[in-house]
Regions:
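Conserved short secondary-structure transition element at the edge of the structured enzyme core
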Residues: 31-36, 70-106
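Flexible C-terminal active-site loop/helix
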Residues: 97-127
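Short helix-capping segments at alpha-helix termini
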Residues: 11-17, 94-97, 126
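Catalytic alpha/beta core domains of metabolic enzymes, predominantly
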Residues: 1-79
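Surface-exposed charge patches
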Residues: 28, 89, 119
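Hydrophobic residues within well-ordered, non-membrane alpha-helices that form the packing/core
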Residues: 54, 90-91, 121
């Protein structure tokens, strides 16, 4: 969506209205502009980190450069394939799921994409 509209929407709604982003890529900027939070794909992989970063941004502190790079890298993890396939594969690599099996209509990640995913996760210290 148009991030410039966050302030406009915030002013038009009551204080009780929860304004959430559905886009991981722009959610930090969305919250910095007054959004309340995000319905996030990435948070399935690193929930506590997303909470920490979200709280920091909403408080006005913003993300440090290394945090912003890590956030971008996490977003990059979930685009190796159609959602939720990369998330499920990542959770398998993290030993959260015992098996990488999917039920239809989902199918297993392509081997090349799976290798890229595990390599990225290893470089980030996630597994």
């Amino acid at each position: 969506g148009d991030l410039e509209r966050v302030d406009e929407i915030r002013k038009a709604c009551s204080k009780e209205f929860v304004l959430s982003s559905g886009d991981d890529n722009s959610c930090m900027e969305f919250m910095a502009k007054g959004g309340d939070g995000v319905i996030s794909v990435v948070s399935n992989i690193m929930p506590s980190q997303m909470v920490q970063w979200s709280n920091k941004v909403r408080s006005g502190a913003g993300l440090a450069d290394d945090e912003a790079r890590a956030f971008t890298a996490l977003n990059d993890l979930v685009v190796f394939d159609t959602n939720p396939i990369p998330v499920k594969q990542a959770l398998h690599f993290m030993d959260v799921f015992a098996s990488p099996e999917m039920r239809l209509p989902l199918v297993a990640m392509e081997q090349d994409a799976s290798k890229q995913l595990i390599d990225k996760m290893l470089s980030m210290g996630m597994v």
